Amino acid sequence: TCALPICFYQNHRLYVNSRDDNQLRGEEVDLSTLKSNCGNKTMDGDRILNPCGSVANSLFNDIYTLVSPMTLTLNESHIAWKYDLEKFKNPSNYGDPSYKWLYESYPDLIPKEKSEDSASASFNGGGVQNEHFIVWMRAAALPRFRKLYGRIERDIPAGTQLEFQVKANFFVNNMEKALVVTTTNWLGGRNLFLGWSYVGVGVFCLLFAIAFIVKQLTCPRKLGDVKY
């Protein structure tokens, strides 16, 4: 069990496996294979979901717009890993009405076509090539997680108040969601869990090393002695 607020286990085996990677690469996949991989998230009425699966069809689709100060811009491009960008392609029959496409399921967040705005998450393409979607499809390891939404690429003076307009499309029931503004460096964003994990493992290894040193000093092993 997980005490309130309810946690979102994006790495649950049934959830993370509910997808078809060949379909996400833009390949044609037969319906029986899609049903095997995506279960009840394969069809919407008599139309095939493209993409299918629980991960794609639970996309976080809140919209954040930086409205103040006017001198700052929220850049939503280049937020996905370069390796991930290469794994998502729209198929040759993109737009076929026998399928229900991502831009129909999430019209506020996902456009159909590529954007000409270099700061847009759809600068590389619409549909499954939208970077917000690609970021979401990389499963988080922990039940409390963050997903990169955009970047402010200018220094912000201390004391500056940021005002965001939020369109809350993603329904939550006894869960928490938040907009976090943080500073990143070449190692990534602030992550207390990862830091304490490294400290814990380091202390554990240090204690073991001390124990082995004490053992070697008090009861040394003779070279070639089979008793040890």
Language-model segments: which ranges?
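Short, small-residue-biased leader/transition segments that mark boundaries at the very start
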Residues: C2-L4
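Membrane-proximal loop-to-helix boundary features in eukaryotic membrane proteins
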Residues: F8-H12, V16-N17, D21-D30, S118-A119, ...
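Extracellular-facing/secreted segment signature in eukaryotic proteins
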Residues: L24-D155
